[in-house]
Regions:
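Short, charged/polar surface micro-motifs in flexible loops or helix N-caps
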Residues: 12-13, 22-24, 43-45, 89-91
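Short, conserved, surface-exposed binding loops centered on an aromatic residue
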Residues: 9, 29-30, 38, 58, ...
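Conserved short histidine dyad/triad with adjacent acidic residue
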Residues: 16-31
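Short hydrophobic/aromatic-rich beta-strand segments that constitute the beta-sheet cores
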Residues: 17, 46-48, 85
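A short beta-strand-loop-beta hairpin characteristic of the jelly-roll/cupin
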Residues: 30-61
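Conserved metal-binding segment of the jelly-roll/cupin
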Residues: 19, 58-79, 88
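Double-stranded beta-helix
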Residues: 79-155
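Single conserved hydrophobic/aromatic residue that forms the stacking wall/gate
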Residues: 1-7, 11
Length: 155
């Protein structure tokens, strides 16, 4: 009775995920809304791109971090880590994006924006496009080629 309908309404407007480590992704996610990270077990580092620089944000067990909107980010989760991530459900006008940066020069290699309806399905075609094209994975500054992720490359 007390705030139950209010809590239900808030839940309908949020995406709530429990995410376990380790992970092996090299992409950065762009979200036009805030994301709340709460680290339940272990620790993670959220790599962010801010003003052309790589900024790492450590989040230890029991800590929270509110990522501002429009900050490209790449959570690096260690073995055994468990975290809670809360995002706002997207409106029809919201765009998500995926970006990749070169390892040594931190140069943008590729970015693609889209309307996110299902995180499990919508990321996959972008991953496949990026990892299947060596030109997209080549740093314009150094010529370094990011290794293809075999999970997303067709034989």
């Amino acid at each position: 009775p007390v705030c139950s309908s209010a809590a239900s309404d808030v839940y309908k407007r949020q995406i709530v995920m429990i995410v376990a480590g380790p992970n092996a992704r090299k992409d950065y996610h762009y979200n036009e809304t805030e994301e709340l990270f709460y680290q339940i077990e272990g620790s993670i580092v959220v790599k962010t791109q801010q003003d052309g620089k790589l900024v790492e944000v450590p989040i230890n067990e029991g800590e929270m971090f509110l990522l501002p909107p429009k900050i490209p980010h790449s959570p690096v989760r260690s073995e055994g880590s468990i975290g809670l991530v809360i995002e706002r459900k997207r409106t029809n006008n919201d765009k998500d994006g995926l970006m990749w940066f070169s390892d040594t020069a931190n140069e943008l290699l590729y970015e693609e924006y889209f309307h996110l309806t299902n995180i499990e399905k919508d990321f996959l075609p972008v991953f496949k496009r990026f990892y299947s094209d060596e030109k997209l994975r080549t740093c314009p500054k150094t010529g370094e080629v990011m290794e293809a992720d075999s999970r997303y490359v067709s034989d």
